[in-house]
Amino acid sequence: MTYISVFCFIVSLFLAKFLHKKWLLGVACALCFVYILFLVFDTILLIYLGKHFGFYVVVFIKTSIIGAPISTFARELIILSCVVIGIVLFCVILYQKISPNLSKNFKLAFLFILFLIIAFLTNPLYINAKEFYEIYNPPVAKFKKITYPYLKVPHSKAPKIRKNIVYIYLESYNRDYLNSQVFPNLTPYLSNLDNKIDFTNITQVVDTEFTLKGLFGSHCGINYTYVFGKDKTDKNFSENIKCGSEILKEQGYYLYFMKGADLEFQDTRNFLKHRKYDEMKGKTELLQDGEKSLNAWGVNDDDMLEVAWNDFVRLSKEKDNFLQTLLTISTHAPDGFLSKTCENLPFVSQDGMLRAVQCTDYLVGKFIDKIRLSEFSKNTIIILQNDHPLPYSNSGSVETNPKNSKNIFMILDDSINGTITIDKKGTSFDSFTTVLGYLGILDEMNFGRNLLKVDSMPFENNDEIYQKASRILTEISYDEIENKISH
């Protein structure tokens, strides 16, 4: 459709001289500006995010651009500004070239209008605009009928293994980084961890491609459609479903979360409250503990992990059981950030993002070593997972395609002998459910499945069933699901 749109637009340019009045030509040039701007903007989105303009992009801008440090996107803003100036100049030149040669021909003027309208109607921006209406007005009953057979009400039982959990989410970390054939010597620590179960065929579910949605999808085994200024800030948002953290809390676990960025960004604080976390730390809280080194997004990973270590020791001594959830920041798109501790590492690449990847490998690897060498190791399992693959990068040397890269998901436990590799198909919805399954608590949670015992959902990771469920998330009723099963 894009090719048809561009063809019709080019034809309309040749027909513009038949508008015969300068004010009509002025209106036409203004419409040309709008069309070209839409087309260029959509093309940029396609290059960087792999998606046309639509609801996903609006949500991404709303949650991941607004409130983000401007310096991080300085290059993109400069390019966009230059593009806008270039389009304006093109339209001015177009007007100046055509206006002296206007001629009167109503038939050809009509064709100009026709081709320009077709160009707009076949523009990807217009085509995807209808998605907004469908999202805000879902056929709830129809979507329930489609999704309920696959949604599983979580029924927990006392854990067979009652250990503390350190759950580490690696920001924008592709599994391909661990592949020595693709990136030799890039991740010597994380690639060589032992006493683990390594799940090698995990894909990211559609519409969980940025941090908050990645965390939600992992915790809850389901995703949600972002509703602006509405449900997500409600204290009761998503309380109609149960997620992994709440289930652990019911089992007596103390819930702790920390990341280097501000907890207000992407409404992380509200998410944690909804998920019943007891203790939360972000940039503001970390800076209150003393001076820290900062990057554009927040506290650097070396300082954050130092605080995390001290808190791990404190929690191990004070709490019977706890979940310590950590989110790194060094590999945040588009270029990553280098912690001061990593400045003298023997980097295998001078690329900014790959240096950040290697730094994260070093810092997280050392953090894991400290836990495993401590007196608390036997009573602790460590989970490694990326929140989502790298969405985009300014780097020309990062050859990993986020669409094709698998997710990282590992369970580390001293009780595991060697390395157990599981190549069973799974999704990011299955990770937290599998951790609960490893502990013996449950095997099914919403769309999540315990990959140690049962198969994942029989759908591709971008199947519409996930999107339909996300659009009616706040309407899902466990009572309705169980009543359907009983009947």
Where on the chain are the PLM-derived regions?
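Transmembrane and membrane-interface helices of multi-pass
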Residues: 1-136
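A sequence-composition feature that detects small, non-aromatic residues
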Residues: 16, 28-30, 68, 74, ...
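A diffuse structural propensity rather than consistent per-protein peaks
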Residues: 44-57, 136-140, 211, 243, ...
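Short extracytoplasmic/periplasmic juxtamembrane "stem" segments immediately C-terminal to an N-terminal membrane anchor
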Residues: 61-64, 136-152
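Basic, amphipathic N-terminal segments that precede the first structured/catalytic domain
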Residues: 118-139, 289-300, 304, 308
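Solvent-exposed soluble domains appended to multi-pass membrane proteins
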Residues: 151-487
